[in-house]
Amino acid sequence: MNLNELKNDWINDFANPMIIAGPCSAESESQMLETARRLKESGAEISAFRAGIWKPRTKPNGFEGVGVIGLNWLKKVKEEYGFKTATEVANAHHVFAALEADVDILWIGARSTVNPFTVQEIAQALRGTNKPILVKNPVNPDLALWIGALERLLGQGIENVGAIHRGFSTYQKTKYRNIPNWQIALDFKNQFPNIPLFIDPSHICGNRTGLAGVAQEAFNVGYQGAIIESHEDPDNAWSDASQQITPEVLADMIGNLQIRNSGISGYEDEMGKHRTLISDMDFQLIELLSQRMKISEKIGTLKKENNIAIFQPERWKVITEYANQKASETGMSQEFIEKVFKAIHEESIEVQNGIMIDR
């Protein structure tokens, strides 16, 4: 059996879309129960209550989770409010403890997905389970690693799986905590339309303001669910406070989302995917142009300090020849590429002029 042959009927037992919500971290029994109570009373259709029991942190000495005791709090949430429960596992010990506590849904985090040894250890510990196991994309944009993690689960007989798109790390400063890079997620969806795909806007945005927009983009292209961080007192959360929202805000956000019929066929569904890719590429273009202009500023400063003219004909000749060559190789119109590079060059000259006259 391969991944394309999986039926993944498990998701049909949940609402569409399937929303998994709860705090980033389990902090105390009262915090868990209060968040669950407010989620229940908010009116939002929440399929499962999530909470991090063990927290892999970027740096040591941060809050790394309450550990096994938090599993008892998840049990109480299930008993008192009827939610299915979900948590992250990062090694065999976590798996055994979570299974013993009868956690309903487990996920493998982005930092684990990057390491095949870790994924293999987790997969072997999960062998034989019929619980849904979700896999977050790796922190780096590597589709093969993401697919490989799911294949390792399948290799251990685990057939109820799903994928979580949580964005990708970047050294550049952007409006996202983790850039969505929609193209990779949609490549995954195109290869495996049978595997439920969830959006994690909390980790993509890293803030509260962009959550709804990212979630809507995902549902526009047929994602089946979302995993969103919600806390009874977000400002005082012990981890990732800036990206968590109250249950009431979450309910309002979910209520305003437009859920697309994943069964739609034809040009509209395909067009939505293409437009999402174009939007992602446009964002990357703007980011690259911004970086290019910052480098132009540095060059302008050097020219000013060394009394060198802004316009360098030989350099411009090299740029245009290279651009025309690449246009020819890629089948693009040389006239179009010349217009683009002339516009970029003019803006670069304007930037450097500003440096020269201290504007």
Which residue stretches match the model-derived regions?
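N-terminal amphipathic alpha-helix/helix-capping segment at the start of soluble metabolic enzymes
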Residues: 1-20, 76
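Active-site mouth loops of central-metabolism enzymes
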Residues: 17-34, 60-63, 83-89, 109-110, ...
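Hydrophobic faces of well-ordered beta-strands that scaffold small-molecule active sites
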Residues: 17-23, 47-51, 85-87, 106-108, ...
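Catalytic domains of carbohydrate-active enzymes, especially glycoside hydrolases
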Residues: 34-53, 101
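Glycine-rich, proline-tolerant flexible connector loops at the mouths of alpha/beta enzymes
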Residues: 50-68, 232-241, 299-310
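Catalytic beta/alpha-barrel core
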Residues: 64-66, 83-95, 104-118, 131-143, ...
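Catalytic alpha/beta core domains of metabolic enzymes, predominantly
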Residues: 118-252, 256-261, 265-266
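Extended, charge-rich alpha-helical interface modules
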Residues: 259-359
